[in-house]
Amino acid sequence: MVNKFLYPRGGSESYMLYLAEYLKKIGHEIEYFGMYDENNTVGNSKGLYTKNMDFHSKGLARFLYPFKIIYSFEAKKKIMQVIDDFKPDIVHMNNINFQLTPSIIYGIKKKKIPLVQTVHDYQMICPNHLLYNFDKNIPCEKCVKGSHMNCIKNKCIHGSGVKSVIGAIEAKLYSWIETYKKVDLYICPSYFLENKLLSAKGYYKGKTKTIHNFINKEKFSNNQRKEEDYIAFIGRFSKEKGIENLAGAAKLLPQYNFIAAGSGPDEGMLKGIENIRLTGFLTGDRLTELMGNAKVMILPSVWYENCPISILEAHCMGVPVMAMNSGGMAELIKDGVTGTLIDDPSPEGIALKLRETLENEEYYINLRENCKKEKDNILSVEDYAEILIKEYQKLIAR
């Protein structure tokens, strides 16, 4: 298993660690490769990792990072050494850019090992990984088939000209030399993402498979739901997550209570609104309880969400979800059956759909009951692994 971070940090790490733990449980041998960090919870028997890259450091190392995050000779060399020692049947990559770089693909394929990658974002077709223009607060696909100069012009990466130049160079380089063509199979968590890859480059054809994300179904199915009168938002407080529009909708609906769990740069937009309570960043049982007891959960994301696990978790607990009719969200919610899809992302559009959903009691009760049935269609880690292993076996047998 390959990922730049080897400890629980975000969604891709949680996915990798949980999946790998289950694969080990059923008899598979697994080793890991990534960046060294004192927080690492997994590793490899050779003890080989790339050096930790602190992008906030000062001095000479900082000036060398632009070169290292485009192509890493260190990462390529070390992953080949790990492969020589462990002799895997297959390599499964997750997030590799910047800290590991796509250079490792060349090292892996030099060893003639089948290579799979789970695609957690739009990195291969968009320099900022999100298909999103932060300045205009709208989805953006200008680099998908157009020039990567758009990334530089719009300062798409953290609003930084330097970072955007580096990101554009990296994207252009690996697109030009067709590095991603060398991967044998791409696991896509949504059909939306799969279709974006296929429309971007012809060489992805025949190399993609959509498998929706899995969750710990036992944990969420056993939740004792005690419905309370609030609308839940769980996520990062930032523009692309639709925080500004959520704040506006709450102001238009003073009769409804909102609870927002998370943190982020735009938290100020939610402060001072009387019917919004902020809990801070929550994890574990507190987060599950907040989600499970909500009247509905809302995802007002402006960017194209891939396959939000929170939607799967909410449905498993019988909580209807309201989300934008875009990206992978539209695949997970059956409009009018397990939730409501919102076409108009404005505060007025969100407020209208909330009223329509919550003020029609019969409609709302049907949503809730349908969600309870929907959990049978959600993948567990056992279901997911069964599908994945079959794909592994096909590649190994070639």
Tell what function each PLM region has.
Residues 349, 356, 363-378, 384-390:
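A short, well-ordered alpha-helix in the C-terminal region of glycosyltransferases
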Residues 3-9, 21-73, 77-85, 264:
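N-terminal strand-loop element at the rim of the active site
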Residues 110, 123, 138-186:
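Membrane-proximal helix-turn-helix segments that form the acceptor-binding/catalytic region
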Residues 280, 335-336, 340-347, 356-362:
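Conserved acidic donor-binding segment of nucleotide-sugar-dependent glycosyltransferases
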Residues 192, 214:
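Carbohydrate-associated surface elements
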Residues 268-289:
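Nucleotide-activated donor-binding/catalytic signature segment of Leloir-type glycosyltransferases, i.e.
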Residues 320-323:
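Short hydrophobic beta-strand element within catalytic cores of glycosyltransferases
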Residues 187, 224-241, 247-251, 259:
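Conserved donor-binding/catalytic core segment of Leloir-type glycosyltransferases
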